[in-house]
Amino acid sequence: MKNKLAYICSPYRGNAYKRIRNIAYARHITRVALELGYTPIATHLYLPQILNDDIPAQRRRGLKAGKDILNTCGTIIIGAKYGISEGMASEIEAATGKDTIIII
């Protein structure tokens, strides 16, 4: 049986306006993934509620947790509408060999 877990990769950081926009976009991509039959995992929708993304040590911890979760997923879904952030580029590099879906 194919692994239907899909890691949602889209921007998060930015000023208050961009964060609101980016969170809405991540929710949209997550909804699309569900409609495509995937079980989506969007770590940037819940880890910032626990960790402070503006504190470098906590950001690194969150990025590592995300990559650990990414390793369990068969697919990465990339939301590229607002570009590829540094964090996204790192996740995309870590996802080499996984099925990839790009949503713009």
Question: Over which residues does each language-model region extend?
Answer:
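Catalytic phosphate/metal-binding cores of nucleic-acid and nucleotide-processing enzymes, i.e., regions
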Residues: 1-104
